[in-house]
Amino acid sequence: MFDILMYLFENYVHSEIELLVDEDELTKELTRAGFHQVDIIKALSWLEHLADLQESDKPYLCNHAQHSFRIYTKAEMAKLDVECRGFLLFLEQIQVLSVETREMVIDRVMELDEPTLELEDLKWVVLMVLFNVPGNESAYEQMEDLIFEQPEGRLHS
């Protein structure tokens, strides 16, 4: 399912081509690209739920402190290792993620059918969430920089 999300993001969203095709047409294209029907349905449902989170009349979170500390459930810790959880905390500290967008990221991560998530895959989920939440253009650009910019020179001597 994650491969389909990446395919859609790279071929439609990130390339700035408008996604104005209907679901049946998109399903046919993804099938021609070699993806399985079951995974296609899961991926489209995942994207639909992401849009629902963003378009809801109610805020995603209510009654939260901006400087609260996130305690992860056992299931979340199983899917997001220490490195991934640390990265989410880092993104909050540099204000790429707010409390609300962090929770949206965790919600979408938990809906992926992978048992664990690599840091590189988490970065893409963050990018997808930020892209779909209006008013986060600056955070999206910062996240893009974190994904695409490679450090120059040697990190260690």
UniProtKB/Swiss-Prot annotation:
> What is the official name of this protein in its record?
Protein Smg homolog
Q: Which family does it belong to?
A: Belongs to the Smg family.
| Database matches in PANTHER family | PROTEIN SMG (PTHR38692:SF1)
The record ties this protein, via NCBIfam families, to: PRK03430.1
Could you tell me which species this protein originates from?
Shewanella frigidimarina (strain NCIMB 400)
